[in-house]
Structure formats: structure tokens, C-alpha cells
């Protein structure tokens, strides 16, 4: 077979992964202009006489297994007087889906790309398959009507089957998703996608390994040692953190503890206020006692003065000795009264010192109480 013979012409390790710009700007443009292609690896295929599952042998490049195949095809009209393209085969037909996408070379429009899906049977009762094809045509005006005749270059591939959880979402093959991106970005995203997939696989294996270790009873004695139990548990970034369920009993216990703490603070406030009020009462009592002692001393002094005056009036003209005795007695009384006043003033000073010490003690206890409240709130 000619295609099989030509497949051996490429050197070992040859890979053919052209971009959209390369397919349209180089291969298709040279094909339409009948110019020689340096390495002619794209076959001419009559798309209407071959089934998609036969493209693997007809479009083989070298001996490497491939998941996408390239070929040139010439479009023909379905009807001689119509405008529709004939895309029917013996087993089914190719149906266009979605809108055509523009292919740019830098900022210049060079072509359009159409996406088609292969259906088995005949319309409208065809059965959809996993075969996808991208059809490229030359175009210089994006709004121009599509050309229904002429050469096109095609890329055909099969969508990967969905397995497991992937059945919930429709997953296209890597080549299909790769071609949906802008052609200038594909060369950058391909290695990044590979690296991200490798990281995801390593993460999944690590997670499964850790879960198996946690589920199995290893029986290591050093894990159950007290010194290891007292250590804080380290959080692993690779494992998802699970939230502990909060029960109603835990919530009620927290509320009870909160109420008890509030009552404790209120009792402390009441006791502190009572202490301050009792201190004020003691101060008042001391002041009243000092004042009473002072007034008693003054009363004695005044009474002695009055008595001395009465004695002087009644005994005026008496003996000189009695006057001297009265004067001495008066002097003694006066000295006694002075001593009582001095003692009263000394008691006042001592009371003021005690009051200052009491106030300073209260201030210190108040500061300690505020610190205690700040630490326990």
C-alpha cells in the first residue's frame, strides 16, 4: 500500500504536531498553490469513501502509535446546484457543530476552522460517535460565506472514553482540548498541563498512602508514649482539615461556663465596692472620734477657765497664798490643756497617715484587680 510504504520515509523519533497557523499558512497554502512541500507527510484522502476508523492505517506517519491523523481532502457539493457540502460516507456522516473559529497569523486572518462530529447511520436518526474532526480552509474575510469547494486540511481524532467519575462530565481527548486553545498558547500550555497532571497524581498517591497508614493498626509502641502524646499535633498541608462537629451539649456547656464566669465577675465587683464602702465608713468613724476628743478637751479648758474666774471673784481680797495656789493651779490646767491639744493634733496626724496608707493599699488592690480581670476576660 502506498501510504504504508511512504510511512517509512520519516526518520526515527519524528513527531508531527503542527499548529493551526502552520497547517493553514504553510501546508494548506502550498497545497492550494500546487507548490512543493518540504516533507510531505500529509496524505490525500477521499473523505467520502473512507470511514474514520480506517484513517489510522491510511494516514500513518512512521511506526509510532498516534491519536490524531492529518490529511488533505477536496470538498464537493452535495447537489450540483446547491451550496451544501457532501460529508456522507458509507457508514454514516460528518455533522458540523458550533461556530467556525478564525485562524490568525499574528494579527492577520489566514483561515477558518470548522468542528465536525461523526454519526453512524443516516440523518436524522444517526448515532453519535467519539470521532471528532477539525476542518481548516483558507479565508481572508471572517464574514465571507464559506467556500463549499476546494482543498481543505483536516485533523481527525477520537474522543477518550469516559470512565469512573469522568462519566458525569463530558471529557474530550487531549488533542481536542489542545486544539481548542489559541494556537500561539498551545506550545506553552502543553508542558504546564503535563506538570499539573503529574502534581495531581503525586498528591492523590500521597493522600491514599496516608489514609492507609491511618486506617491500619501498625502497633508501634513509641506512638503511644506519654511524651509523644503531650506534643502538639502538627497540621499537614497535604491533607484536608476536617471540622469537628459541634453538638448541642457542648454549646450548652459553653453557655453555662460563660454565665458562671459573668456571675463571678459580678460578685467580685460587689465585694470590691463593699470593701471600698467599709473603708470609707472606718475613715468617718475615725474622724468623728478625733473630733469628739478635740471638743472634749476644749470643753474641759473652757470649764476650767470659768471655774477659775468664779473663784477669783468670790475670794477677792483673800490671802495671797490662795491666789498663788490658784495661779499655779491655773497654770497646771493650762499646761494640761495644751498637752491634750498636742495629743489631739498628733492623733490627727497619725490618722491622716493611716488614711493615706489605706488609700494607697486600695489603689494597689484596684490595679491588681484590673489586671486580674484583663487576664481572665
Swiss-Prot record:
Name of protein: NAC domain-containing protein 76
Region of interest: Disordered: 312-347
Molecular function terms from GO: DNA-binding transcription factor activity; sequence-specific DNA binding; transcription cis-regulatory region binding
InterPro entries associated with the record: NAC-dom, NAC_dom_sf
Quaternary context: Interacts with NAC030/VND7.
Organism field: Arabidopsis thaliana (Mouse-ear cress)
Localisation per UniProt entry: Nucleus
Organism lineage string: Eukaryota, Viridiplantae, Streptophyta, Embryophyta, Tracheophyta
GO biological process terms held by the UniProt record: cell wall organization; positive regulation of secondary cell wall biogenesis; regulation of DNA-templated transcription; xylem vessel member cell differentiation
DNA-binding region: 110-165
Residue ranges with Basic and acidic residues bias: 318-336
Lineage top rank: taxon: Eukaryota
Gene behind this protein: NAC076
Residues covered by the NAC domain: 10-159
Primary location class: nucleus
Family indicated by similarity: Belongs to the plant vascular related NAC-domain protein family.
Domain notes: The NAC domain includes a DNA binding domain and a dimerization domain.
One Pfam match: NAM
Tissue-wise expression: Detected in root protoxylem and metaxylem poles and in vessels of protoxylems, outermost metaxylems, inner metaxylems, shoots and hypocotyls. Expressed in roots, hypocotyls, cotyledons and leaves. Present in developing xylems. Specifically expressed in vessels but not in interfascicular fibers in stems.
A GO CC term attached to the entry: nucleus
UniProt biased composition (Polar residues): 337-347
Protein's job: Transcription activator that binds to the secondary wall NAC binding element (SNBE), 5'-(T/A)NN(C/T)(T/C/G)TNNNNNNNA(A/C)GN(A/C/T)(A/T)-3', in the promoter of target genes. Involved in xylem formation by promoting the expression of secondary wall-associated transcription factors and of genes involved in secondary wall biosynthesis and programmed cell death, genes driven by the secondary wall NAC binding element (SNBE). Triggers thickening of secondary walls.
Alphabetical keyword list: Activator, Cell wall biogenesis/degradation, Developmental protein, DNA-binding, Nucleus, Transcription, Transcription regulation
Amino acid at each position: 500500500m502506498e501510504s504504508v510504504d511512504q510511512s517509512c520515509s520519516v526518520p526515527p523519533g519524528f513527531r508531527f504536531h503542527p499548529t493551526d497557523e502552520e497547517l493553514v499558512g504553510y501546508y494548506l497554502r502550498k497545497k492550494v498553490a500546487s507548490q512543493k512541500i518540504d516533507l510531505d507527510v500529509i496524505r490525500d484522502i477521499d473523505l467520502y469513501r473512507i470511514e474514520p476508523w480506517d484513517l489510522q492505517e491510511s494516514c500513518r506517519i512512521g511506526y509510532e502509535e498516534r491519536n490524531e491523523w492529518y490529511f488533505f481532502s477536496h470538498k464537493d457539493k452535495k447537489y450540483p446546484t446547491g451550496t451544501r457540502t457532501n460529508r456522507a460516507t458509507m457508514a454514516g456522516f460528518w455533522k458540523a457543530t458550533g461556530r467556525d473559529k478564525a485562524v490568525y497569523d499574528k494579527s492577520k486572518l489566514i483561515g477558518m476552522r470548522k468542528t465536525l462530529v461523526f454519526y453512524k447511520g443516516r440523518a436524522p436518526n444517526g448515532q453519535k460517535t467519539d470521532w471528532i474532526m477539525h476542518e481548516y480552509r483558507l479565508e481572508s474575510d471572517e464574514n465571507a460565506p464559506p467556500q463549499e469547494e476546494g482543498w481543505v486540511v483536516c485533523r481527525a481524532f477520537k474522543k477518550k472514553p469516559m470512565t469512573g467519575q469522568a462519566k458525569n462530565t463530558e471529557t474530550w481527548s487531549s488533542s481536542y482540548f489542545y486544539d481548542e486553545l489559541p494556537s500561539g498558547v498551545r506550545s506553552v500550555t502543553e508542558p504546564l498541563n503535563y506538570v499539573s497532571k503529574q502534581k495531581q497524581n503525586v498528591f492523590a498517591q500521597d493522600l491514599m498512602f496516608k489514609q492507609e497508614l491511618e486506617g491500619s493498626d501498625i502497633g508501634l509502641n513509641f506512638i503511644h508514649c506519654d511524651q509523644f502524646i503531650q506534643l502538639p499535633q502538627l497540621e499537614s498541608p497535604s491533607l484536608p482539615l476536617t471540622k469537628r462537629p459541634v453538638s448541642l451539649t457542648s454549646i450548652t456547656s459553653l453557655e453555662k461556663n460563660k454565665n458562671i464566669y459573668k456571675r463571678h465577675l459580678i460578685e467580685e465587683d460587689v465585694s470590691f465596692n463593699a470593701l471600698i464602702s467599709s473603708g470609707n465608713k472606718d475613715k468617718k468613724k475615725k474622724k468623728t472620734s478625733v473630733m469628739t476628743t478635740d471638743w472634749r478637751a476644749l470643753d474641759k479648758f473652757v470649764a476650767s477657765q470659768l471655774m477659775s474666774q468664779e473663784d477669783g471673784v468670790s475670794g477677792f481680797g483673800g490671802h495671797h497664798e490662795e491666789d498663788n495656789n490658784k495661779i499655779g493651779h491655773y497654770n497646771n490646767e493650762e499646761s494640761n490643756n495644751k498637752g491634750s491639744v498636742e495629743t489631739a493634733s498628733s492623733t490627727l496626724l497619725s490618722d491622716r497617715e493611716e488614711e493615706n496608707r489605706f488609700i494607697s493599699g486600695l489603689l494597689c488592690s484596684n490595679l491588681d484587680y484590673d489586671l486580674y480581670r484583663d487576664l481572665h476576660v
